[in-house]
Regions:
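Terminal targeting segments of Actinobacterial cell-envelope proteins
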Residues: 1-29
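Hydrophobic membrane-insertion alpha-helices, especially the h-region
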Residues: 29-43
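N-terminal amphipathic/hydrophobic interface segments
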Residues: 45-74
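N-terminal beta-strand/beta-hairpin edge segment
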Residues: 65-144, 152-205
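Short, cysteine-centered beta-strand-loop-beta hairpins and adjacent loop/turn segments enriched
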Residues: 96-102, 204-212, 239-240, 292-297
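Acidic, Ser/Thr/Gly/Pro-rich low-complexity segments that form flexible
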Residues: 212-214, 228
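Hydrophobic/aromatic beta-strand elements that line small-molecule binding cavities or substrate pockets
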Residues: 215-220
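Extracytoplasmic/luminal low-complexity segments enriched in Pro/Gly and acidic/polar residues
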Residues: 221-299
Length: 299
């Protein structure tokens, strides 16, 4: 007896109930994927709404023309919102006016362990929103520093970084070294210090003459007093003079014009100052605070 090969027509057809189970399983998978996408979309939508509400309240408190940037970290958002506990919120804003002096202050803040019931966020009750740990920075531009006494006596005030060694000792006729505040070791980010060097330059009137003066000073963060202090160390004449050496009598008369102090209580993010960094044209103050109200961040 000769056997013949089995053809496709000879194979048993799948049962109708098996086909139905396969289609039903695919429908469940598709439905599950759609449900997950809807939940993720709802989560991101709710987070965006909360970020918008916080941004609007911060805009009102900080007297801004535009909404600041607010990012609520962590996923899923809804579990954080329902519990009123947020692990990490980032807030950044620029162009913040402070009192009648500063007009263009920039703020960056990292808020951790935030207690913010959803009802308080939607109702704008910022006093009920508390921050467990706050790490922030406030950047003040040279144009704003020039509005603070006694720096307001200096015309065309400019700010540049310098090294502590150069501020204290000069260079005995050599050019100023590259500031350590701009870069530390290769591949590493800038590091903040409680004190660092700065070069302040501008024009001052003395004995009826307009003098270009370079002041080499230290900026020091005083955590106990909550202040940032400019401590002038020495002066040099600018390039419009025949010599850079400033006579002792002139130094004594002009040095107080560079002796300034900034209270962090007068700035947004009323923090304890922990570090200061000088960049070309600005000074950045870093600080920390604990157990503060969101409503108090603009004080």
């Amino acid at each position: 007896m000769v056997s013949r090969p089995v053809t496709r027509d000879d194979r048993p057809a799948p049962r109708p109930d098996a086909r139905r189970r396969g289609r039903r399983a695919r429908r469940w998978v598709i439905a599950l994927v759609v449900l997950v996408l809807l939940l993720v979309g709802a989560d991101f939508g709710a987070a965006a709404y909360a970020e918008h509400m916080i941004s609007q309240k911060a805009r009102t408190q900080l007297q801004l023309t535009d909404d600041p940037s607010v990012t609520i970290h962590g996923f899923p958002f809804l579990t954080q919102a329902l519990g009123g506990d947020y692990s990490h919120i980032s807030v950044s804003a620029a162009g913040i006016p402070v009192a009648d002096k500063l007009q263009d202050v920039a703020v960056n803040a990292e808020l951790e362990n935030v207690k913010a019931p959803l009802s308080d966020i939607t109702n704008g009750n910022t006093k009920a929103i508390t921050v467990g740990e706050l790490t922030g920075s406030v950047t003040i531009k040279a144009a704003d520093l020039a509005r603070l006494a006694p720096l307001d006596k200096i015309k065309d005030l400019r700010i540049e970084p310098s090294t502590s060694e150069y501020v204290e000792n000069g260079d005995a006729g050599q050019s100023e070294p590259t500031p350590t505040t701009t870069k530390t070791t290769e591949g590493q980010a800038d590091q903040d210090e409680s004190r660092t060097g700065v070069r302040i330059s501008g024009h001052l009137q003395f004995a009826g003459k307009d003098l270009e003066i370079f002041c080499f000073a230290m900026i020091e963060a005083d955590a106990a007093k909550g202040t940032i202090n400019f401590v002038p160390k020495r002066l040099q004449f600018g390039n419009d003079q025949e010599t850079t050496v400033v006579p002792a009598a002139v130094q004594k008369a002009l040095m107080p014009n560079f002796n300034a102090s900034i209270s962090t209580k007068d700035l947004p993010l009323s923090v304890t100052p922990t570090g200061v960094r000088v960049q070309s044209g600005s000074v950045t103050i870093k600080g920390k605070a604990a157990n503060v109200s969101f409503a108090d961040l603009s004080k």
